[in-house]
Amino acid sequence: MEKVLALLLVTLTVAYAVPDPRGIIINLDEGELCLNSAQCKSNCCQHDTILSLSRCALKARENSECSAFTLYGVYYKCPCERGLTCEGDKSLVGSITNTNFGICHDVGRSSD
């Protein structure tokens, strides 16, 4: 009986030691349900309406709608990809009501 328990203990230890590449709570892929942007690989947890489920989504591309900032960690429009800037409303009221939408622009390219 002791050998069986020891074998079971070793098996469980090895099973827990192997990292799972797919996230359950963090490191979530695009399309998976989320509660906050920090859970997503893309750092964007997005929903369409206040009653809809939030899912991880890709960040906004150039010339697409974006949100500059959110207080809640969930966006209606995702923030811009790296290197782009969200040109639009950056007010506190817009952040509270989650209506601070803009358009992603490449500032470096537009100044040339």
Swiss-Prot record:
Keyword Secreted (UniProt): yes
UniProt GO MF annotations: enzyme activator activity; lipase binding
GO cellular-component term (any): extracellular region
Removed propeptide positions: 18-22
Disulfide bonds: C34-C45, C40-C56, C44-C78, C66-C86, C80-C104
Segment forming the signal sequence: 1-17
Subcellular location: Secreted
Record keyword Signal present: yes
Tissue: Expressed by the pancreas.
Gene3D superfamilies in the cross-refs: Lipase, subunit A (2.10.80.10)
PROSITE patterns hit by this protein: COLIPASE_1, COLIPASE_2
Keywords: Digestion, Disulfide bond, Lipid degradation, Lipid metabolism, Secreted, Signal
Broad class of the protein's primary localization: secreted
GO terms of biological process kind: digestion; lipid catabolic process; response to bacterium; response to food; retinoid metabolic process
Name of a matching Pfam family: Colipase
InterPro entries: CLPS_chr, Colipase, Colipase_C, Colipase_CS, Colipase_N
Role summary: Colipase is a cofactor of pancreatic lipase. It allows the lipase to anchor itself to the lipid-water interface. Without colipase the enzyme is washed off by bile salts, which have an inhibitory effect on the lipase.
PANTHER family, per database record: COLIPASE (PTHR10041:SF8)
Name the record gives this protein: Colipase
